[in-house]
Amino acid sequence: MSRTRIVIGISTAVGVAAALGVMAAPTAGAQAHGHDGRFTVVADHLNNPRGLSPAPGGGLYLAEAGRGGKPCVSGGPEGETCAGLSGSFDLITKGGHVKRIITGLISASGPGGVAAIGPVSVSRGPRGTFYGLFGLNTHVIPPKGAIPDNVRTKALAQLGRLWLVKPGAWVKTVSNVGDQDWAWTKRHSDLGPTDWPDANPNAVLFSHGSRYVADAGANALVRVKWNGNARVLHYLAMPANFEGDSVATCVARGPDGALYVGELLGGFYSPEHARIWRVTAHHATVWAGGLTTVQGCGFGSDGAFYATEFQTDGLTAQNPAGDVVRISQNGERTRLGVGKLFQPSGFAAGPDGSIYVSNCSIAPATGMGPQLCPTGGQVVRLG
């Protein structure tokens, strides 16, 4: 299934949940136990906050997917898609002040600014730089005349792109990874689902001098070479009798040097089917299973693996509650943020042992109603 339809389609269930006041805590699997811990809102009133990355000085880089814009045109997952220039790449200081480094970026959402797609991920680079990633690809852009020319021009220049952002907000386009992944799925249509060709870059990682992208539409881990060419390192195959895609959503470097890639679905919409893949230069294996709707992942300073679960009861459930699953080095699982996280997405680890998560990640700054994310998107600290 197209990652575009997955994310924006969620907002229908979210709206129902808000209307019904469904705010129950998620059901914890038998293999994990809960732990409340400290919960602190670092920043709120954010527009669809997604990927996070540590920044110099104890701050955080953040990708805000924006709140869409006007006009809204027919043909979107909810009947309409509202495109605008409300996305941004941000710096959240150690004191919680949000500095929007680059603004006016492409953003497409459902009506009301919910479940926007635009800037989706960030990763700290060398010498004060960071990488910024946009979702989708240019093949999804409507024809000339369907949306304002300035919005369409930005969409053509930004969707599916990987940027390097240098001090002073100087930007260099590193790769059109989304379009290259789309072309790869077209060439390999025998591997994937019926809606291929498709591509939707969802997470970027700069590590050991290389750039990696988890593509939710192509179901693949991709390496972006220094000439901008995108090379698929591993395709996340669906299991037998699958109902949906694997949907690669996050990538992290482990203490052992391997790459770890998380899935949203793992081939099924019901809970506890998402997997974490361990990828080395020679092979890829499923390292962990039994997770649900993984959106962000990474390793903490304690060596444990963390995964944000977007909706713990499953993608099609009306309950918007999510959590973070901690997998210790001995395999023990603990759930964090239970009853406090709703559609969490991005993950970053702090050097002090705290972890940071983008919460209410499909909410505009104005929220989604009095009972669901009333202060809009957030970045929160656990621990």
Where would I find each of the regions flagged by the language model?
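Extracellular beta-propeller repeat domains
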Residues: 29-383
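Secretory targeting and sorting signals
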Residues: 1-31
